[in-house]
């Protein structure tokens, strides 16, 4: 567990993320997905149940809003990332500097024609060269992988396919307007393997309010042996079929605490299967949450929350396995992880003290001169034998 804590901390927290998130503006490759908000008035009007424009706005006004919502220029993100990279590199000059291992391309790049896809990939590949990143991971819908050749993507720098499964449970897929099933997903996984590319998975958590059903999705994910796991929250946007269901009372959303508890179980299950590259994205349509949000849990610091919970579980088990009752203990660790160990407002330590009837838990910074303590995530629990008043 200690090793997995170190790895998830490096992958999810310390490491900066280069994420290029293309908005999804069409149902192409996503069938008739209930959670999609589509930037295509003509296409939308041909799909049953989607022709009503909200708030009685005129078509011209609606198109104007949609257009502004979906504007995305990859060069803007590249410029921002380059500036961040150069500034941080300058600050850490002379040190062992490493920014990230991978670039993530998420969302709707696959909805463009091939020429546009390759043009966008060329820009990102050039950026990757400048910042010294060798791995580029591209998210693709299941139907895209099944219907198109993906081998050519390797020529454009893509080494990993993030398969946008949405879910791995047939019932969840069916209820959300997707025509493919788990059988088709396994075919897509096999096709990626035949292309000699790494395979990762992205999925939306919370499409079902049945926790057992959600956890079965993760069990199936483990069987597919993904390199990475991209987890998105089920955020309901205005103008979607799920929005109609929610308004009518036919869609139940998980509470904040239910979401956190389920995510904790999902992360724990993933770590046990040695899936340590876990990326959290707010929504499949993250670009337009601000303007079109209706309901759903949105976290600004879910990575930190999950790592904090992982440390609590580790410390809890560590003390339990010591089989020594003591009212005072000392936790030695690098100062950089003190916050994760303590939890928000010392919540982790307070719970430990209450459960084990302790009076005091001291936090001591690990001696950096100790060669065995080079890892920034080193953690040691010491039983204090001295008597205290």
Where are these regions (language model features)?
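Auxiliary Fe-S-binding modules of radical SAM enzymes
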Residues: 1-20, 34, 92, 97-99, ...
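N-terminal [4Fe-4S]-dependent radical SAM core
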Residues: 1-99, 104, 130-132
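Core AdoMet radical
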Residues: 44, 65-81, 85-88, 97-114, ...
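Canonical radical SAM enzyme core domain
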Residues: 72-77, 115-119, 125-152, 205-216
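Short, electropositive alpha-helical surface patch
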Residues: 121-123, 211-227, 285-304
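Alpha-helix-loop-beta-strand connector modules within alpha/beta enzyme cores
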Residues: 121-130, 184-200, 258-269
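Acidic (Asp/Glu)-rich catalytic clusters
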Residues: 152-157, 194
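Conserved strand-turn element in the central/C-terminal portion of the radical SAM core barrel
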Residues: 188-213, 217, 232-238, 246-256, ...
């Amino acid at each position: 567990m200690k090793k997995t804590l170190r790895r998830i901390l490096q992958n999810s927290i310390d490491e900066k993320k280069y994420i290029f998130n293309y908005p999804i503006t069409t149902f192409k490759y996503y069938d008739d997905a209930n959670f999609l908000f589509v930037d295509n008035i003509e296409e939308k009007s041909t799909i049953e149940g989607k022709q009503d424009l909200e708030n009685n706005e005129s078509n011209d006004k609606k198109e104007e809003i949609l257009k502004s919502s979906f504007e995305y220029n990859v060069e803007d993100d590249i410029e921002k990332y380059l500036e961040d990279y150069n500034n941080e590199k300058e600050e850490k000059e002379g040190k062992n500097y490493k920014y990230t291992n991978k670039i993530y391309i998420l969302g709707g790049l696959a909805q463009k024609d091939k020429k546009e896809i390759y043009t966008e990939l060329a820009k990102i590949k050039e950026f990757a060269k400048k910042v010294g990143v060798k791995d580029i991971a591209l998210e693709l819908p299941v139907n895209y992988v099944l219907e198109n050749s993906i081998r050519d993507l390797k020529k454009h720098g893509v080494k990993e396919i993030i398969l946008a499964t949405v879910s791995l449970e047939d019932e969840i897929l069916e209820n959300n307007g997707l025509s493919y099933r788990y059988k088709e997903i396994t075919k897509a996984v096999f096709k990626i393997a035949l292309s000699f590319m790494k395979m990762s998975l992205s999925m939306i958590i919370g499409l079902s309010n049945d926790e057992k059903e959600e956890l079965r999705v993760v069990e199936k994910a483990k069987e597919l042996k993904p390199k990475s796991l991209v987890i998105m929250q089920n955020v309901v946007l205005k103008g979607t079929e799920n929005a109609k269901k929610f308004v009518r009372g036919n869609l139940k959303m998980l509470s904040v605490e239910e979401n956190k508890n389920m995510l904790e179980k999902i992360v724990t299950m993933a770590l046990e299967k040695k899936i340590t590259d876990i990326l959290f994205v707010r929504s499949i349509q993250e670009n337009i949450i601000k303007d079109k949000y209706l309901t759903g849990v949105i976290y600004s610091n879910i990575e930190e929350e999950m790592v904090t919970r992982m440390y609590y579980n580790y410390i809890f088990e560590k003390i339990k396995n010591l089989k020594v009752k003591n009212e005072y203990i000392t936790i030695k660790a690098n100062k950089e992880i003190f916050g994760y160990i303590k939890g928000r407002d010392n919540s982790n330590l307070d719970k430990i003290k209450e459960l084990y009837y302790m009076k005091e838990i001291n936090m001591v910074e690990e001696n950096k001169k100790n060669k065995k303590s080079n890892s920034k995530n080193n953690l040691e629990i010491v039983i204090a034998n001295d008597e205290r008043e």
